[in-house]
Amino acid sequence: MKFTLSWLKDHLETDATLDEIVEKLTDIGLEVESVDDRAAFRAFTIARVLTATRHPDADKLQVLSVDTGDGKPVQVVCGAPNARAGLVGVLGRPGDYVPGLDVTLSVGKIRGVESFGMMCSERELDFSDEHNGIIDLAENAPVGTSFAAYMGFNDPIIEIGLTPNRADCTGIRGIARDLAAAGLGTLKNTLPDAVKGEGETPVKVILDQDAGNPFCTGFALRMVKGVKNGPSPKWMQQRLKAIGLRPINALVDITNYVTFDQGRPLHVFDAAKVKGNLTVRTARDGETILALDQREYKLNAGMYVIADENGPESIAGIMGGEHSGCDENTVDVLIESALWDPRMIARTGRELGIVTDARYRFERGVDPEMMVPGAEIATKLVLELCGGQPTVLDVVGYKPHTARVIDFPVTEVKRLTGLDVSYEDAFDILKRLGFGVEGDGKTIRATVPSWRGDVEGKADLVEEVMRIHGINRIDPQPLPSHGAVNGRILTTLQIRTRHARRMLASRGMMEAVTYSFISEAQAKAFGGGKPELKLANPIAADMSDMRPSLLPGLLAAAQRNADRGFDDIALFEVSGIYEGDTPDKQRRVAGGVRRGTAKVEGAGRFWAGNAAPVGVFDAKADALAALEAAGAPVDRIQIEAGGPEWLHPGRSGTLKLGPKVVLGTFGEFHPDTLEALDVSGALCGFEVYLDAIPEPKAKSARTKPALSLSLFQSLKRDYAFVVDAAVEAGNVVKAVSSADKKLIVGVQVFDIFTGASLGEGKKSIAVEVLLQPQDRTLTDEDLEVLSKQIVASVAKQTGGVLRG
């Protein structure tokens, strides 16, 4: 919301300075976002260059004799390439502050020649980036006058950021009212008397709506005959330009002016272009309207229009139509002031993608009691600027506003804010804000004014009292100290999340944050798409479902990087997925994707050989590393071949703890999945469920036991077993490990071989077994006994035999 200082003072009688006004606005909750005070240029003078001679000691400098209008030329040294005799520019004198250079001018010598000022460029004055030369004004610019006055920069522009509840401050009068209540002046009475019209308005208004649920709660219409519509006066144009509006013509500018002045949107129709009466009704499916922004909008039955016999002439409360717009040929004008349902305005504006000053105000809620005065203000301006003869104002469907009454115990201020405010002060503040007040010394019975539709209860009155009384008057208090924090601060799941995140980052993966919303097609490709997980009001068509997996978002992110030249990339995310619409169906998951050659050991080409494409074992290693970091008992995890349908059936696995607890899945992606997501390249991924990891058993002692290291040398033994081709290597590893759990501390597969020499349907799996004796050195007899145990265990559990 922008306004100029002089515009504010039309409503506020005050002697406060600009700085005081700006500070007070922020204090009372109307936060000032910017102040454009070009009046700071008032010290700079328009001056004419009389002569320009070359500097005696510098080829690129000139010595100028400058006329400032007082008959006493000033000598200035200047290096601008466009400096010349006859140029009219802007002179800064000693003592003037130059904002673009952040310096204060003084008399100085430049290469031995005194300079008594500076001819300025636009960038040096900080109102544009132009710096190719000094400012070159029109030849008839008045020499000796203030540059700020000449440019119309005497009026500072203030911009405030409004919260959605403060609809009353979408007009400058509302801002002035708050400042007056805060003690910074007196609110002027600027509302005019009703304009006396002659004769009825020939165009009637028909409200075609459900009387029990109206979308238009009032409509005022008046015709002014015989107007002369030309440019608006200079003062109005300057104010509109200052707040970023483009002057069009007097009639249109008046509606814009009243919109910002009073927070009361209006519209004007060229009466000659309106056929028959005006009907406020729902739009018909397929109807179109060419709006004032020169765009054609397709309407539907959920929208509302003001129509005549030709069809829609205005999108109600949002934007008028081009067909009935006012131009320089307008003679008879219809002035409209109406009340619209804020929800209807917001919905229609959102569907059509239209943002206007009228929509901004109506969807927040305008003052219902300003409908008629707003029309009177506009009528008075039309008569002053365009002439004409008004008819009687025709008001349809309006019912007087019923004020809300709130019983407000003043003790609520102390209870909710800790601020001590007396009954008398609270009473006075609410009265100054326009509330009707009466009370018994303890409780104030407050009648909410029509312009404060956001005040609904006691807490809102506390806010009003507090912001006017002054938040800065709250005494600062130190936070109470309760000593050291006892016990654990983070939950188990938070600790697991932190550890998993650090582990995956340490493995060369980059953390990503993807949307929790994905398209229906993506959701179905990853086991989702349930009706209860569809968004009621999605922000986009491709963000309609809550994600059942982290992998769709990560795959899309990896592909976007690949499209931009980053083919080898590893991404991970630790976040939530959704299996249902209840809290227990939201799971905490760590997921990751590797693409191209983005392996742990490095990606791309290097002197010792090119990195191979990522595959199932890279995803498996990531999944196990994340689970181990999160505290899962990885030594007890079982790995089953195969995974969910979005993974390759022969190159994927499932990590389980017992027959029921699934800790995660990993593998390469199914080609159909990649095609559905429009993703290509070598890709693998994983997901581990951090909330499925069992809680560790409680330990009797908080300290870790002493580390016990064996004093005896460890040793390794290799074994090769011939097994059926369907036997998994993991089962052989488990069988070997179970032969002697105390002595065998590690088993690793180092070779898998298939060939005719083994027989049809057979394969050889070779493992390295790490042995660690604890109490003595192993003898040959001990190793022989252990070998027999290993062979017997493998034969029993897998049917394998020792390869000869």
UniProtKB/Swiss-Prot annotation:
Residues 710-803 form the FDX-ACB domain. Mg(2+) binds at residues 454, 460, 463-464. Coiled coil: none annotated. It is found in: Cytoplasm. Its cofactor is Mg(2+). Tetramer of two alpha and two beta subunits. This is Phenylalanine--tRNA ligase beta subunit. It comes from Brucella melitensis biotype 1 (strain ATCC 23456 / CCUG 17765 / NCTC 10094 / 16M).
